[in-house]
């Protein structure tokens, strides 16, 4: 393992150290607590007021170097690498050279205070710089795999843990990051709306995937392990997932389908969602005992604008059956969420 093991430390791209398994790897940075505001009396329009937020060692660079090192050290044998880059999560921090490239493209903009993160003089330019930075790192990894002669034997999956955040730091609405979905509060990250749980899932495997194509198959993260096990010829442990390998290689007719998909999110007031064919059931404010399940026909109402629960009580009843069958008591009490009786 290499990276951060502290949620608070992870909210700074210039931390004083990272972790390699059980030991600290110190970086040439000073401790700057997350959320540190501008100095008192500092001019928010002066770029130099933000100098303390850009230090010496950009942690994604060190993580990327370890990715390349791992690939080189294991090039003669099968390997599994999970690279969970913090880019482009808040706060908005990137090397100045790349930020200035986008300042020239976008022009001047209003700074942000940070709202619990670090302030930023050019939030749009910095967010774009972070996306470009990660894109170049992925390109560098692909180039290294080709140089080592293992590109055609390596599967790469690029995806995200959730939809765009609604805070002002990353300006996801300005960038239309969730397009065509909304990404404001209650619609993107930390929600079970389509803007919160629908995201790209990009797979590359040298020349072994028949042809580049886009597929609308509906799956979810429990499908990842069965998929990789299927490709590797390894027996899959019992899970809720189904291998997506037929879809990835363009054999959609051989793809096994889920009877339904189920999500829970205990954060905030609590969410539950069920996808059953073209129907999506959504239960909000679970922790408040809400039992008014919303129902959407996502084939015709992808943006979830028209709740048709009152018109389809039979579908709503079936959704509750799925919820009862799927909800289990979590081992971690922090994730506990009681499902209300109906």
Where on the chain are the PLM-derived regions?
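A short aromatic-rich beta-strand->coil structural motif
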Residues: 51, 67, 80-83, 228-229, ...
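Active-site rim elements
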Residues: 50-57, 117-129, 186-192, 208-219, ...
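C-terminal cap/loop subdomain of S1 sulfatases and analogous C-terminal strand-loop tails that border
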Residues: 1-11, 164-194, 204, 208-213, ...
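Aromatic- and acidic-residue-enriched segments that line the glycan-binding/catalytic groove
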Residues: 18-20, 87-111, 169-180
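A structural signal for well-ordered alpha-helical segments within the folded catalytic domains
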Residues: 58-65, 125, 132-139, 197, ...
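Loop/turn elements at helix/coil->beta-strand transitions in domains of secreted/extracellular proteins
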Residues: 1, 74-81, 150-156, 257-258, ...
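Formylglycine-dependent
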Residues: 1-79, 85-94, 113-121, 125-128
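Metal-dependent active-site segment of extracytoplasmic phospho-/sulfohydrolases and closely related
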Residues: 82-85, 130-171
């Amino acid at each position: 393992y290499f990276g951060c093991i502290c949620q608070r430390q992870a909210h700074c791209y210039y931390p004083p150290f990272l972790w390699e398994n059980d030991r600290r790897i110190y970086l040439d940075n000073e401790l700057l607590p997350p959320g540190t505001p501008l100095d008192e009396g500092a001019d928010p329009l002066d770029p130099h007021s933000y100098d303390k937020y850009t230090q010496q060692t950009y942690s994604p660079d060190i993580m990327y170097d370890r990715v390349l090192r791992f690939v080189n050290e294991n090039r003669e044998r099968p390997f599994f690498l999970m690279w969970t880059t913090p880019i482009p999560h808040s706060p908005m921090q990137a090397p100045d050279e790349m930020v200035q490239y986008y300042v020239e493209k976008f022009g001047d903009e209003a700074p942000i205070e940070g709202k619990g993160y670090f302030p930023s003089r050019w939030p749009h330019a910095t967010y774009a710089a972070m996306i470009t930075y990660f894109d170049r790192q992925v390109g560098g990894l692909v180039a290294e795999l080709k140089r080592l002669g293992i590109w055609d034997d390596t599967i790469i999956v690029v995806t995200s843990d959730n939809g765009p955040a609604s805070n002002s730091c990353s300006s996801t609405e300005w960038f239309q990051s969730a397009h065509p979905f909304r990404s404001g509060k209650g619609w993107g990250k930390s929600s079970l709306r389509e803007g919160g749980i629908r995201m790209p899932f990009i797979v590359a495997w040298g020349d072994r995937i028949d042809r580049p194509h886009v597929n609308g198959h509906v799956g979810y993260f429990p499908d990842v392990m069965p998929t990789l096990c299927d490709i590797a010829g390894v027996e899959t442990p019992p899970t809720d997932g189904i291998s997506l390998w037929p879809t990835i290689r363009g054999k959609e007719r051989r793809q096994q389908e889920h009877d339904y998909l189920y999500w829970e999110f205990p954060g905030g007031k609590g969410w539950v969602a069920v996808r059953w064919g073209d129907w999506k059931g959504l239960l909000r404010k679970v922790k408040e005992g809400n039992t008014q399940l919303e129902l959407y026909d996502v084939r015709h109402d992808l943006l979830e604008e028209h709740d048709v629960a009152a018109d389809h009580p039979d579908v709503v009843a079936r959704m509750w059956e799925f919820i009862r069958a799927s909800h289990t008591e979590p081992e971690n009490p922090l994730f506990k969420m009681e499902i209300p009786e109906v």
